[in-house]
Swiss-Prot record:
InterPro entries: Ribosomal_bL19, Ribosomal_bL19_CS, Ribosomal_bL19_sf, Translation_prot_SH3-like_sf. Belongs to the bacterial ribosomal protein bL19 family. The keyword Thylakoid does not apply. Keywords: Ribonucleoprotein, Ribosomal protein. One of its GO terms (cellular component) is cytosolic large ribosomal subunit. It comes from Burkholderia ambifaria (strain ATCC BAA-244 / DSM 16087 / CCUG 44356 / LMG 19182 / AMMD) (Burkholderia cepacia (strain AMMD)). This protein is located at the 30S-50S ribosomal subunit interface and may play a role in the structure and function of the aminoacyl-tRNA binding site. It holds the Pfam family Ribosomal_L19. PROSITE patterns: RIBOSOMAL_L19 (PS01015). GO terms for molecular function: structural constituent of ribosome. This is Large ribosomal subunit protein bL19. GO terms for biological process: translation.
Length: 130
């Protein structure tokens, strides 16, 4: 492992101190809680939407979440290891066949729906036994 990769790995571990980032994939509906500073006040803002892309680049990893706000599509890019992220909660698993769901930008209504990934009973039983 070269020096830059080692430093990057240390920074990732430092950024994750006390935080856990759940496994999520494109198509999943997530709630991202972001720390927002307004003047002297600090508050947590929730942003809920569908993950349309994940970019894995070490410390520079990010993901794009898309939601419909007042009938208008809004996309926001989050840095995965940012200290501004309070938490990420996976609300629903989506069943898609693409890594990047940019085609959702042109779609609205029923055509923009994503099937839900149903976990079989065998997998849930195996997961609970471990």
């Amino acid at each position: 492992m070269n020096l830059i990769a080692k430093l990057e790995q240390e920074e990732i571990e430092r950024a994750l101190a006390g935080k856990t980032i759940p496994e999520f994939a494109p198509g999943d509906t997530v709630i991202v809680n972001v720390n927002v500073v307004e003047g002297t006040r600090k508050r947590v803002q929730a942003y809920e939407g569908v993950v349309i892309a994940i970019r894995n680049r070490g410390l520079n990893s990010n993901f794009i979440v898309r939601k419909i706000s007042s009938g208008e599509g809004v996309e926001r890019t989050f840095q995965t290891y940012s200290p501004l992220l309070a938490s990420i909660v996976v609300k629903r698993r989506g069943d898609v066949r693409r890594a990047k769901l940019y085609y959702l930008r042109e779609r609205s209504g029923k055509s923009a729906r994503i099937k839900e990934k149903l976990v079989s009973k065998d997998r849930t039983a195996a997961a609970s036994q471990e």
